[in-house]
Every structure is written in structure tokens, then in C-alpha cells.
Amino acid sequence: MNWITKILKAGQNIKERIKDRASREELKSSKWMPSCCGSAPVLKETIFNEEQLNTCPNDNCQFHYPFPPRSRFDHFYGKNNWEEIDTPRIPDDPLSWPNDVYKKKLAAARKLTNQRCSVLVALGERDGVKVTSFAINSAFIGGAISIESAEAILKACDVAIQNQTPLIAWSEGGGQIMFESGLSLQGMTRTVLGVNEV
């Protein structure tokens, strides 16, 4: 067997292994998932429950899986003990990317997360104290901060100042979104100034 035949055979083996893998839909609907700490597959219900709070039960691992903002607010404030604050809407795609690349990414992220941007703002009560909070959703384009996300953070700061409440932030993912270039970097400065006001 010459070297070309070996390479072709190896490529064929790789293709067959890829075909044998489960699809994304099958993985989502399955009760099982790959373990984060390299052991055998684990039941999803052992990780995604009220006791574990999306954290690996293995004491040597304690890996934290993403925790969507609405679930986080339900856990922190108590179910139905908080209200979602409307945040300013900014026009999509301020730099007019060709072929609507950015608009398509935004549409897919909105459909996946049921959020307008990566930041969700809430006002609720915890142990008799009113608290304003915001959470970043890593499922929304990796939790990247767009102009609209920065405006949402500023809205959280304004609500905290107006209601004289503490402000709690849960960051998951982040960084400025590349599709908005320098415009999103301006948002970083504004959010720092807003948080300093609180």
C-alpha cells in the first residue's frame, strides 16, 4: 500500500466516523450528554436541576454550564418575583455588512434565546430588599456586547439609581461584538461610566 492509498483510507475512516455521530437534534432530545470531566456520559437531569444549578456534580470538576438569564433570575429572586425591564432598541447592523451577515446572526440568536440582545435586565425583590440586576447570555452570539447590549446595561444602571437599589451583574461570555467594530467599543466606555454612577 503506497502513501496515497493510506491517506485516502484514513480520510474514508474519518468520514465514516463522522456519519456515525449523533446529529445536534438527537443530542438535544437525548437524556444523556458527554461528561465535562472525561468520564462516562451523564444524565442531563443530574446537572440541570435546582440543586446543582447547571454545575457538574463531580467534586473534582465543578464545571459551570451556561445559566440562561431568566433561569438565573428565577433562582435569585424566586419564580415570578421579578419583572423584566424594557431596554432601548437600536437599529440592527449599523455598519451595513454585505449579504446581511450580521442581521442573519442576530435573527438566529434572537430565535435561540428569545432575547433582543445578549443582556437581560430585571428588577425584583430578594429577602425584602429591592434589587436591580442584569445578566449576559452566552448563547446570544457568545455573550458579545453590542451597542444595544451596552444600552441595556446603562438602562440597568439608570433603574438602580432611580429606585435606589443595589445593582448585581452576572457576566457570562462577553467582549465587544466584532460586527459593530468601534461603535461597540464606545459602549464599553459608556457602561463603565454608568456602573461608576451607581
Describe the function of each predicted region.
Residues 1-198:
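Terminal-region recognition feature
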